[in-house]
Amino acid sequence: MLPDLSPHLHTKECNMLIEFLQRCHSEKPIGKMIGKCSYWDEAVWQCTKKERIWRRDNNPAYKRRIVELRSLPEKYWTPALHKLKEDGVLIGGADQSQGCKI
C-alpha cells in the first residue's frame, strides 16, 4: 500500500513518478488491474521509501529542523529516476519551487 500521494508531501522527483502512475491508471483502467502499471507503482513505492529514509537520516533529534525537503539528493534516487534523467525527462537540481518544507 502506498502512502498519501498528495503533491505537497513529496519531492519533485517523486511527484513526477506519482504523476506517471496516475496517468497510467487513467489511460489503462483495466490494465492497472492486471499489472500494466506495476513499473510505475514500484517506482513510486521505492521513491517514497527513499524519501522517508532521507528524512530519517537528516532529522536532528534535539535541534530545530533546518533542512528543507524539496529535492531528493541523487544518492537517494531510485533506478527509475536515474533512467528518467538519462532520457532527459527529469532535470535534477534546477527547480526548487516544489516539494514540502519539513
UniProtKB/Swiss-Prot annotation:
Q: Where is coiled-coil annotated?
A: none
This protein's GO CC annotations: mitochondrion
- Write down the superkingdom of origin: Eukaryota
The sequence motif named Cx9C motif 1 is recorded at 14-24
Q: Which UniProt keywords apply?
A: Disulfide bond, Mitochondrion
Motif Cx9C motif 2 boundaries: 37-47
List all disulphide bridges recorded for this chain.
Answer: 14-47, 24-37
Q: What are the subcellular locations of this protein?
A: Mitochondrion
Q: What are the CHCH domain coordinates in residue numbering?
A: 11-55
Is-annotated flag, keyword Disulfide bond? yes
- PANTHER family xref list: COX ASSEMBLY MITOCHONDRIAL PROTEIN, COX ASSEMBLY MITOCHONDRIAL PROTEIN 2 HOMOLOG
Protein family per UniProt? Belongs to the CMC family.
What does this chain do?
Answer: May be involved in cytochrome c oxidase biogenesis.
Q: What is this protein called?
A: COX assembly mitochondrial protein 2 homolog
